[in-house]
């Protein structure tokens, strides 16, 4: 038997539906994602920490879940909002239905609401703080009060919260269909050593680095530059992650010191924003951010348009770029900056997600650019 659930926004909007996950309360910034598939990858993406994700595609849960599709060791999304939960989860890789998965991971979620109306509110008013209450004896007043009590993501440093606490090595490569697994590559077959700062790294990023010949050492977000340089890396990677980049002063300082060397640097998502801040630019909070797998981005050097996966609520302010940083990619949705490169260093970054998971891999060649830079330095 289903239990009732409420989604309340800080502006007082109320949506009533049914609980499809754990009972209880969750609060966070409510955002919408336009991807048609990949809900498990989205839920386990650390970049969604403290965010309640609304999926605009109406039918979510058709394919169930599988451990192989997780992008981290746990669910990071604060909650899930969907329109319709299919009665049947059908896929040869399915090991657990979506409701079972949500309950097992203690995720509060709601289905059966008008996600189109909700998305219009978020588009017109911007991302809002919200609360999901699920179970018996829930009240609209309590949900609204909880939503208004959430402080918001501006000024919130979440990178050090989601980051690994210990350094570790990574040699698992991209998924293989024939084995339904991610093969481990022998270190002797990986010519490049990359140190990756974990600000909330997705596993498919690490796998794509390995697939291109990189032995990856993952270090905590607060690792000093001196410890990274002592590992003698061929390249340094700055990962994706949640929250506001500006409070991450430890990361900005480490990146500044690494940029004083000639070691190639590549950043994605939060790593892109941190590279910009370390180079003297500024970041801004976006209205409703970019969340989806169908965002067109243009390469400003070639004019080529690529469809990309996006997940960010902050952006680099192009007007603040110093003279030694140039724009190399732009969003064709709103013109916001999507990529930068240093003109005086071997350092570049991309705001979206070249690793996809979920989404298209049009921008995956940026990983090749990174390995090419490491090869050139040798």
UniProtKB/Swiss-Prot annotation:
Record CDD domains: GATase1_CPSase
Enzyme Commission designation: 6.3.5.5
Region (CPSase): 1-189
Catalytic activity, reaction form: hydrogencarbonate + L-glutamine + 2 ATP + H2O = carbamoyl phosphate + L-glutamate + 2 ADP + phosphate + 2 H(+)
One GO MF term: carbamoyl-phosphate synthase (glutamine-hydrolyzing) activity
SMART domains linked to this entry: CPSase_sm_chain
Class of the enzyme per the UniProt entry, highest EC level: ligase
One GO BP: 'de novo' pyrimidine nucleobase biosynthetic process
Active-site positions on this chain: 269, 353, 355
Pfam family, one: GATase
Glutamine amidotransferase type-1 domain: residues covered: 193-378
Pathway: Amino-acid biosynthesis; L-arginine biosynthesis; carbamoyl phosphate from bicarbonate: step 1/1; Pyrimidine metabolism; UMP biosynthesis via de novo pathway; (S)-dihydroorotate from bicarbonate: step 1/3
Alphabetized UniProt keyword annotations: Amino-acid biosynthesis, Arginine biosynthesis, ATP-binding, Glutamine amidotransferase, Ligase, Nucleotide-binding, Pyrimidine biosynthesis
InterPro entries assigned: Anth_synth/Amidotransfase, CarbamoylP_synth_ssu, CarbamoylP_synth_ssu_N, CarbP_synth_ssu_N_sf, Class_I_gatase-like, CPSase_GATase1, GATASE
Binding residues for L-glutamine: 47, 241, 243, 270, 273, 311, 313-314
Family: Belongs to the CarA family.
Role of this protein: Small subunit of the glutamine-dependent carbamoyl phosphate synthetase (CPSase). CPSase catalyzes the formation of carbamoyl phosphate from the ammonia moiety of glutamine, carbonate, and phosphate donated by ATP, constituting the first step of 2 biosynthetic pathways, one leading to arginine and/or urea and the other to pyrimidine nucleotides. The small subunit (glutamine amidotransferase) binds and cleaves glutamine to supply the large subunit with the substrate ammonia.
Subunit structure: Composed of two chains; the small (or glutamine) chain promotes the hydrolysis of glutamine to ammonia, which is used by the large (or ammonia) chain to synthesize carbamoyl phosphate. Tetramer of heterodimers (alpha,beta)4.
Protein name as annotated: Carbamoyl phosphate synthase small chain
Species of origin: Pseudomonas putida (strain ATCC 47054 / DSM 6125 / CFBP 8728 / NCIMB 11950 / KT2440)
Lineage, opening ranks: Bacteria, Pseudomonadati, Pseudomonadota, Gammaproteobacteria, Pseudomonadales
